[in-house]
Amino acid sequence: MKLTVLALAAMMGVGGMAASVQAAEVPEGPHVVTSGTASVDAVPDMATLTFQVNASAKDAAVAKSQVDQRVAKYFDFLKRNGIDPQDISAANLYTMPEYEYQKDGKSQLKGYRAVRTVQVTLRQLDKLNSLLDGALKANLNEIRSVELGVAKPEVYRDKARQMAIRNAISQAESLAQGFGVTLGPVYSVRYHVSNFQPEPETRMYAAAPSANQTSAAQTYEQQTIHFDDRVEVVFNLSK
């Protein structure tokens, strides 16, 4: 938990603090401005897997058929592994011509390439390695990304927000007490709306001391996701 106190209004002069106070609409009388920030850590409980499959053929329909067959094979694999069909998306498809360029600079149609993207929402992280292996066995050419996340991010967002609020209040109370004045009511609040893009912190899995060989699952990285928030509050002061 982190908290930064900007300053007492009487101490604020120029630069970023002055602009910050103006944005927060400070009163003419004695007041104090605090900026509360908080960070909440969450352990991922889900992952979004993105794969790409592509195939080339003389005919566009043949290339599409090859891609569709690979995707269908992976769909069957996912169903056998208990993945809800609603957590699978592969509706997008595009085809493009492929050209072969001659030494004289001219191009000749070589064939067509079909591409589909498959996205899977995985809610059981212990199946992560299995689903990655299954995709490669189904000839899905590319593993584009593996993004870890949490199923209910709003819970962590709200917790971070409430912690930032409490810290802003706590700092204001501490400052008022230290300067021998009474903390009055809130005059204004400036909330720094966050995009809430969790920042991952990498932690390597540790192999068991007695293990002679590291398992494949242990080579993947576990993340701690940080949800940060900030609120700026102006309080009135009285003697």
UniProtKB/Swiss-Prot annotation:
GO terms for biological process: DNA damage response. Gene3D superfamilies: Protein of unknown function (DUF541), domain 1, Protein of unknown function (DUF541), domain 2. InterPro entries: 26kDa_periplasmic_antigen, SIMPL/DUF541. It comes from the Bacteria. It holds the Pfam family SIMPL. This is Uncharacterized protein YggE.
